[in-house]
C-alpha cells in the first residue's frame, strides 16, 4: 500500500489484516518496533511489545517521553481497533500520560485494558513496563468513527 495515499477507507479492517500478515504495519508502528502479542477483544485486553531504539533517547540518555506517549497511544487505540465492526475506525480524543520512571533503550511490554466501551466512545488504560517495572501509564479516550465506503 502506498503510505502517502493512505485514506480513511484503508483503515477499515486494517488491524485485522495486519495481525494476519496480509498488510505491512504502518511506518510509525515499524519505527516503534510494535508487535502485538495477544488480543482478547471479548475480555477487553491486549498485550504488545515495543522496541525503544537508541535514536529515541533524550539528552539525559533515557527514552524521550513523546516516544513513550506514541507507544501508549498505539497500545490503547489498538485495543479499541480490535473490537471494531466493518466500516469503523478509531481516533484518539485524549491521552493522559503519567511517567513513572525513566525508560532505557530496549524492549518495553505494553498492557491495555478496556475500562468502558460505549457505542461511540471508549475509555482505555495502558501501561508500559520495562524489566517488570512500570515506566508509564495512560488513560485514553477514543472515538469510534464511521469509515466512508
Model-based region annotation:
Residues 1-149:
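Terminal targeting signals and extreme-terminal segments of soluble enzymes
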Amino acid at each position: 500500500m502506498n503510505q502517502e495515499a493512505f485514506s480513511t477507507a484503508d483503515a477499515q479492517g486494517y488491524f485485522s489484516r495486519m495481525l494476519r500478515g496480509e498488510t505491512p504495519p504502518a511506518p510509525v508502528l515499524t519505527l516503534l518496533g510494535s508487535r502485538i502479542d495477544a488480543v482478547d477483544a471479548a475480555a477487553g485486553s491486549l498485550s504488545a511489545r515495543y522496541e525503544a531504539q537508541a535514536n529515541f533517547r533524550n539528552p539525559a540518555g533515557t527514552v524521550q517521553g513523546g516516544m513513550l506517549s506514541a507507544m501508549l497511544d498505539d497500545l490503547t487505540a489498538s485495543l479499541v481497533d480490535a473490537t471494531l465492526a466493518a466500516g469503523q475506525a478509531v481516533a484518539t480524543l485524549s491521552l493522559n500520560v503519567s511517567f513513572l520512571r525513566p525508560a532505557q533503550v530496549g524492549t518495553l511490554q505494553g498492557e491495555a485494558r478496556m475500562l468502558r466501551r460505549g457505542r461511540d466512545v471508549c475509555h482505555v488504560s495502558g501501561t508500559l513496563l520495562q524489566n517488570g517495572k512500570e515506566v508509564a501509564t495512560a488513560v485514553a479516550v477514543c472515538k469510534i468513527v464511521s469509515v466512508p465506503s
